[in-house]
Amino acid sequence: MKKFWEVLDERLDLCREALMVRHNLLLGTPSDISPIHWQHGGIARLEKGEKIDSLLKDGYSTLSLGYVGIYEMTQAMLGVSHTTKEGEEFALQVMNHLKDACDSWKKETGLGFGLYGTPGESLTSRFCRIDKQKFGEIRNVTDRMYYTNSYHVHVTEEIDAFEKLKFESQFHDISLGGCISYVEVPDMSKNLPAVEQIINYIYHNIQYAEINTKPDVCFKCGYTGEIKLDDDMEWYCPNCGNKDKNEMQVMRRTCGYIGSNMWGKGRTQEISQRVLHL
């Protein structure tokens, strides 16, 4: 475990260096480069030719330290999920360590470093693929095609909506540069009081959360419901068997947004493994 903390601190130093490179590259940028943002009120109202430097300091802008795979990290180090007591303590310890690093950098530089729960898209599968090539297939770590976003409960874990929100809320208090939680639900059109109950719980107990459902449509047969995935990660209509992507609309939330585009293999596998929380 000692080696883990040593490597983590080495990587944090590298992250700080990378973020400072980004900050320094922006210094001296004239407002003319994007008038709608810097001159016309999108972000500020600077004069023509005025540099944006003042807006990069004193916490006005954010240098985000992102992270994915808290679940996989806990599995790799302890062999358990971070929803167990032992795993939860370790995950929170790591998260607080990341936050402390951001706070320290902020104090040293006066810049707005923040800890950000990353909604990785291609990154979620890329990192997993690279680690699998380097370290081999590790159970509950690299044996899938994706890493879990930020601090989220793994999509395959059986947990009800309220327990999931309660568990993840404690990470919201640490990941102040950005955080969000989700619950997966079936068609709730005939059970709106239950939706209201979830929303009420979110309002009173967690910083930011959203509800996911599956409002898919097959344009060939008119089926509405959940378009399924077969073993080859191909979408098909469970009513008529249609596999033509142009003849269906599959709606899922990825990276915080509900969209109907098709996704990479890693994200598609993650979507297929999501369990319902109600």
Where are these regions (language model features)?
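Long, C-terminal-biased catalytic regions of enzyme "large/alpha" subunits
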Residues: 1-278
